[in-house]
Amino acid sequence: MSLPEAYQLEIQALNKQVLQTCPSDILQFCADFFNSRLATERAASISLFRDRGTPSPRFPPSPTNPHFGMMSSQFSSPFGANANPFGGSSSNPNPFGGSASPMSSSVMHRVVEEDESDNHLAPGGSLFSGAFGGDASTEAPPTLRAPPTTDSYPAQYNFSRRTSVSAESLKPSADGFDNWTPPYTDKTPEQVERLKYAIEGNFLFSHLDDEQSAQILGALVEKPIPARGIKVISQGDAGDYFYVVERGSFDVYVNDCGFIEPGPDGLGNKVGTIQAGGSFGELALMYNAPRAATIISAEGSCTLWALDRVTFRRILMESTFARRRMYENFLEEVPILSSLTPYERSKISDALETQKFAPGDVIIHEGDPGHSFYLLESGEAAAFKGEEQVLSYKKGDFFGELALLNDAPRAASVIATSDVKVATLGKNAFQRLLGPVEGLLRRTRYLGVKTGVEEMDPLHTQ
C-alpha cells in the first residue's frame, strides 16, 4: 500500500526545512512547521470563502488538541508564549499569535502559492470538497463555529514549553564537591595597610571578620592605568568590579540622563575627584546595578586594585557556610539545646554574633545579670569565683547557656587567657527565633529545670 501523494509532499517539504535549518529541538520544529502549514492552508481557505461571499466552513478540531478550533488565522497556539528558537522573527504576523514560524516569510509566501496552484489534495482537503469542487450553492451552508473562549482551553494551554534561566553560580565548596579557593595576589605590607585603610570605612566591609578581610585583601587584583583620560567605568554600564585607588587621582562625571551621550559634553558635569586611598564601585559587589557615574583617570601612572562581585560573594559565602557548620556542631554539644532540630540549629547559627577579646579581658562579670549565651570559637578562657579559678574553656566550649532560661546574676567571671573569639546569642534573639526555651525543654523532659540546674552551669547563682 503506497502512501498518499499529499502526505509525501508534506514530508518532503519538512525534510527540506530540516536540512536548511538543522534545528536542535526536532519535535518543536516539526510542531511549528505543521502548525504553520495548517494555519496557512486554513487562512487561505477562509480568504477564498470570503472572496466568494460564502460563509467560512466549520473546521474540525485539531487531532492533537480537542479544544483546538479556528475561525480565523488569529488564534492562540500552545507555543505562542515562546520566542522562536529556530530563527529570527518574521515580518508577517504569526497566525499562532506568538513565535515566528521556522520558515521565513518568503518561504511561507511560496508555500501559499504552491497550495493555490497545486492539484494535489493537501491534508484535510477532503473536508472542503464541497467548497472547492462544483457549485457551492448547491450544497447546504456549512455550520459556523463560534470562536473558542479561554475557558475552553486547558489550564496550561499557553504554558511555556521551555524557559531559560541564567545566573551567577555560587555554591559553597564546604560540601566537599568543590575545591575552590579564593584568588590571591602578592602585595607588600605597605600596600596591604593602604588597602585595609581604604576599605575599613566602607559599609560593605565593616562586618567582616579578620579572616574574611584577609581573603578580600588578598583577592584584590592590580589594575595599572598608564595614561590620563582613560575611562575606568562608564555611567549606565552594568557594574561588576569594585576599585580601590592606590596611586593617582580619578575624576567623577555624572550625566543627568543616566548615561554617556555623544558629543564633547556627553560625560556630563564633573562632580568630584577620588584621590589615593579612596574607592568607588562598591555597589557592584552586591548586584550588577548600572554605574551611577563615569570615572576617568585625571593623571598618568595611576594604580587601581579591583575586586569582582563573584569573588567577593563567594568569599563571604564560603566563610559564612563554614562558620555555620562549626556553630551547628558546637550547638549539638549544648545539653539545653539538644532537642533542637537541624533547621532550628541552623537558624540560631545564623543569628550568632562574633565578639573578640584580648588576653586579660573580662568576657562576663560575676554578679551581672545573665542575658547572653557564649560559644568559644577560638582561644582559651577561664572562669573565676572571686580569686579562685573554677573552670577553663577551649575552642568549642560554651558557657552562660542558662541565660536563655532566666536573668539570674552570673555566679562567676569569665576572663580571656589568650586572644579569644566568641559567638554570642541573647535571650531575646533566641526567643524571637524559636520561642520560649521552656517549650524546648519540655520536648526532651530536660531534668534540672527546677532542681539541680545549677549543676549544669558553674556561672549560675548557687
Swiss-Prot record:
Pfam families: cNMP_binding, RIIa
Superkingdom, taxonomy of origin: Eukaryota
Positions of 3',5'-cyclic AMP 1 binding: 204-333
Region (Dimerization and phosphorylation): 54-203
SMART domains assigned to the protein according to its UniProt record, in alphabetical order: cNMP (SM00100), RIIa (SM00394)
A GO cellular-component term linked to this record: cAMP-dependent protein kinase complex
Annotated spans, Disordered: 79-157
GO molecular function, a single term: cAMP binding
Phosphoserine: modified positions: 164
Compositionally biased spans, kind Low complexity: 80-102
Name this protein carries in UniProt: cAMP-dependent protein kinase regulatory subunit
